[in-house]
Amino acid sequence: MPQNTLNIVILAAGKGTRMYSKMPKVLHRIGGKPMLGRVIDTAAALNPQNICVVIGHGKDQVLNAVKRDVVWVEQTEQLGTGHAVKTALPHLSAEGRTLVLYGDVPLIDVKTLKTLLEAAGNEVGLLTDVPADPTGLGRIIRDGNGSVTAIVEEKDADAAQKAVKEINTGILVLPNAKLENWLNSLSSNNAQGEYYLTDLIAKAVADGIKVHPVQVHTSYLAAGVNNKLQLAELERIFQTEQAQELLKAGVTLSDPARFDLRGRLKHGQDVVIDVNCIFEGEVEIGDNVEIGANCVIKNAKIGANSKIAPFSHLEDCEVGENNRIGPYARLRPQAKLAADVHIGNFVEIKNAAIGKGTKANHLTYIGDAEVGSKTNFGAGTIIANYDGVHKHKTVIGNEVRIGSNCVLVAPVTLGNKVTTGAGSAITRNVEDGKLALARARQTVIEGWVRPEKDKQ
């Protein structure tokens, strides 16, 4: 097997006590995706022979949440990072090298890892950092020539070693030919009673194998998450990076600090996004689209020249060109709007196709429906699509005028150019061009006297 064969081991067995959560630490999200999922994505981009994920605490939750084509290995006892990598040994190739990553270091990037792998060659690679505050972290110990000789955990460090600013990020490249022997020789004779993976550095030096340190160019790339404060800090860093990329690509963000992307955003030119908008999943926005403040848009496609007014929610839907949506509109899954459609305040659409130029400007529910072009819904129109057991379809033709406060009881079909009187409950099909009225005739009672309250 060639020496450049790459195995990747991701350590994800920890409990994460300081998260104060029933959820395993690696499932907490950055940018809408579990941290472990992000690390697996990065690992996969390196095209390794295999990816082995070591899990332990909450393993069933992890397996259910992160369904990926990797090798899952259970660490039944959490006895340290060295022990965790040892559990993965049966799944590693005899030759080549192994890159060790961490499920709670979500922002590590491909570029940094490629640099580390290139520097390590077939020897040992070590990713280091010089943070502003190294408290609690393992220190990099060098000899008089500047060569790395060991890593000392803070709990085991003396005063001189604690004064060292350069720290171990935990990310290592190790030669597989030596890995098993090194792991088998680890001792737990230390302050934490654990098998430290970091002790392999001293073993490599003792075997005459050079350790190649690479300092990460930005500290947050190798930052781990141990509590909700650190999670929030990395979330903001991640969102700031995404906002900056969009700004560089020509998107106008009214306030980059008040923008969240939890997926991917494909955009055209001259897109304007106001404050506090959240984008989730796969979102595509055409040219000259404006998104108002406080919108939530998930898995949606928005055509060119459309405007989404504030406080609108769009999910799993398609908006055609030159639409006007909102404010306070809700487009639910399988809503598909053609061009020039107007959907106004407090209008909800679900599993419905809306034809070109149709308008529903106020207080309307359209569900399980097919609507033609240039139709108008009066305020308060409701499509009653559910009979308590089954959903039923409503078909509405072109140039239909539906009066205010109408109920269309599905299944029902309204032909082209139908008009319904305000307040009607339409339960039967209406042919083209007809006027449908379905309400009680108004009665005025002459001589009626409104009763008065008894005087005390």
Swiss-Prot record:
Binds 1 Mg(2+) ion per subunit. This is Bifunctional protein GlmU. NCBIfam families: glmU. It is found in: Cytoplasm. Its cofactor is Mg(2+). The gene is glmU. Signal peptide: none annotated. CDD domains: GT2_GlmU_N_bac (cd02540), LbH_GlmU_C (cd03353). GO terms for cellular component: cytoplasm; membrane. Keywords: Acyltransferase, Cell shape, Cell wall biogenesis/degradation, Cytoplasm, Magnesium, Metal-binding, Multifunctional enzyme, Nucleotidyltransferase, Peptidoglycan synthesis, Repeat, Transferase. In the N-terminal section; belongs to the N-acetylglucosamine-1-phosphate uridyltransferase family. In the C-terminal section; belongs to the transferase hexapeptide repeat family. Residues 250-456 are annotated as: N-acetyltransferase. UDP-N-acetyl-alpha-D-glucosamine binds at residues 11-14, 25, 75, 80-81, 102-104, 138, 153, 168, 226, 332, 350, 365, 376.
